[in-house]
Amino acid sequence: MNLFNVYTPTLGEEGLEDTIESVQIQSYPNVKHTLVTDTEKGHDQVRTILNKLKPKKTQHFILPEKIGKDGKFRPEYITSGIIHLINYDYWQPLGTGDWFEREHFQNVNFVLEKHDVDWVFAFRNIYDTDKSFLCKDIFESIGFYPVWSTDNYYIVDGQSWCVSKKMLMHLGNCFRFSRENNQRTDKFVFDVFLKNYPKLGCTNKFTMNFRLNRGNEQQLNFARQWYLRGHEVMSEKFPDGKYPWIKDKF
């Protein structure tokens, strides 16, 4: 039975309970959850939540110092190291505040066993900061079709794909180089993975839930409008709901 390990770098921010609980209730039984923090404050906040929830599938790594040359929390730097320290057959990131539907890994495992693929992604739902539903993502993180706003720009969000250990042992260092290439991390990593491992499958299910981060209200409003406009454009382009990026074979 495949072992899946979910990886969440966190400082104990709002929404972590939702993230942890969504892994605990997975219908697929062989799933672990690895939390990593690199500050005392983050450790205390995470510990408080773990003591409250007492999750059986969760392990917590505490790094002795901050990672990143500017002293800030840099999850992409941590990723390149942590992949060598935990057990898994397949690995999936999940950000603090985001969560999976209960059948997420059941669906992922089904595709892995049915098709000759190295990695798998699921579609995502977009939620506002208060967990109110905004829309289904049929416009950006769709893998096999360009994003709604830019031709020839393909991407799967960095929390929507699940990759094999073989891939990470080969390409894991690409996480720490993403900032040096001045690209958003998930786009840079997606391109590197796809170039080297083009056998990408999809569950065709919306089982990853992405929540907008709290912050500058102007930026939040822009993000909301961008997502909603993207959904509107693609809905008008494919009014029958038959999307070309939904495939039965990979």
Language model features by range: what are they?
Residues 1-250:
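Nucleotide-sugar donor-binding/catalytic module of glycosyltransferases
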